[in-house]
């Protein structure tokens, strides 16, 4: 990961904080490497979105509520459905990641920083992208 400034002259943390303040979004945590955003869904459920910064890539990670103690407990039929959905979509993908010792279904999207976050398009694209990803992460 890198902590260098972006082409707009602000650090990753500052850019995320300013952007979220503009949309009245809550930043739970932010560093130069990642940000943790939290939203309240229409169902009143709290949803977390992580934005991880790598050298030239941002990873948007939306963990679902589906978490399992072992690989044996993962419902393979659901995994098959989610893999098929991933194949049908142009943006984002389903995966299983380890979080806190559990196997969690998560929806992710990776994007080159130059193509999204540090461009002017970010001010239009990211709210829609995050909402779209959060909706996809809800079963």
Language model features: what each stretch is:
Residues 35, 58, 103-105:
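Hydrophobic residues embedded in beta-strands of well-ordered beta-sheets
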Residues 61-104:
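Short, internal acidic amphipathic alpha-helical interface segments
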Residues 39-41, 64, 109-111:
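Short beta-strand-to-loop capping motifs
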Residues 93-126, 130-137:
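Well-ordered alpha/beta subsegment
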